[in-house]
Amino acid sequence: MNVGLHLSIAGGLLKLKERIIKNKTEGVQIFSRSPRGGEAKPFNEKELKGFLEFKEEYKLYPLVVHVPYVMNLASPEEEMFQKSVAMIREDLYRSDQLHADFLVVHVGSHRGAGEERGLARMVEGLKILLSENFKTRILIENTAGSGNEMGYSLDHLAYIISETGHEELGICLDTCHLLAAGYDDVSPEGISAFSREFREKIGEERFCLLHVNDSKHPIGSRKDRHENLEQGYIGREGFINLLNSPFFKRVPWILETPEPGIEEDLVKLKKLREEVLKIPADR
C-alpha cells in the first residue's frame, strides 16, 4: 500500500522530481497545468524524457493527474460542457505523455437542471472521452454534496459506472467528502458498512485510489473543507480504522491536506502505516 501527496509542478518536471525526492514520497498527484484551467504549456521534451526515466528508476506509484477545478462535465450549458470535454481530453493527452496511472475527474454540478439531467450529461461526456482510447485510467471522484454537486452518494457513482458501460472507468474516494456526505468513515462499524455497500452497488475492483484528508466539519455537513491529518472530525482513530480496513488499505493513498502541513502529514501517515500495518516508514 503506497502513500503519497499532492505536489506542485511549478518550475517544471525537474522541480517536481526534486520535490518527490525531498519528501520521500512513494506516489504523487499533480495538476499538469493551472488548477484554474487556461492554456496548458507543453512539456519540455528533454525534461519529460528525464522525468520518465526517473519515474521508472524511483518506482513512483501512483502518478496521478487531477483535472482543473473549473471543468464541469455535468453542466447543462453546452459551451461549458464542450469546454470541459476538451479540457479533460487535453489532460488525458498530457497524462499519457507522463505515463500517469490515473486522471481524477470530479463529478460535476447540475447547476439547477436536476440530478437526473446532470448525471446523464456526465455519462455523455465520459462516453466521448472513453471512446478515444487514451492509456491513462479515468477515475471519477466522490463529492461532499455542496450546492448542486453530484457524486456524493454511491447511487450516483454506481449510475455513472453502469450507464457509461466501460470496464476501465474507476473510482477515487475522498475521506473528507465521504464524511461530509454523511458516510461514517471513522468507526469500524461504519467503515465496514460502507465497504459492503460499495461492493454491492459498484464492485470493489472499481475502487482505485483514496484521497486522504481530515475534515473541518462533522458528518453530514455537506461542506468540502479539508483539514490536516488528525486535526479534524476523522481524527487519528479514524485513520487507524481505515488502515485496518481490507477495503481501504488495498489501494494507494494520496494526501490533499492544506498547506502548510501536508509534508508533515506524509511523515505522520507513514508512521501510522508502520504502526498499524508494520510497513517501514521509508522503504
UniProtKB/Swiss-Prot annotation:
Taxonomic superkingdom: Bacteria
EC main group: hydrolase
A GO MF term: DNA-(apurinic or apyrimidinic site) endonuclease activity
Coiled-coil features, chain-numbered ranges: none
Binding residue positions for Zn(2+) 2: 141, 174, 211, 256
Swiss-Prot/TrEMBL catalytic activity: Endonucleolytic cleavage to 5'-phosphooligonucleotide end-products
Cofactor comment: Binds 3 Zn(2+) ions.
Assigned EC number: 3.1.21.2
Residues annotated for Zn(2+) 3 binding in this entry: 177, 224, 226
Cofactor: Zn(2+)
Residues that coordinate or bind Zn(2+) 1: 66, 106, 141
Keyword terms of this UniProt record: DNA damage, DNA repair, Endonuclease, Hydrolase, Metal-binding, Nuclease, Zinc
GO terms, biological process: base-excision repair
Family: Belongs to the AP endonuclease 2 family.
Function: Endonuclease IV plays a role in DNA repair. It cleaves phosphodiester bonds at apurinic or apyrimidinic (AP) sites, generating a 3'-hydroxyl group and a 5'-terminal sugar phosphate.
HAMAP family, sorted: Nfo (MF_00152)
Protein name: Probable endonuclease 4
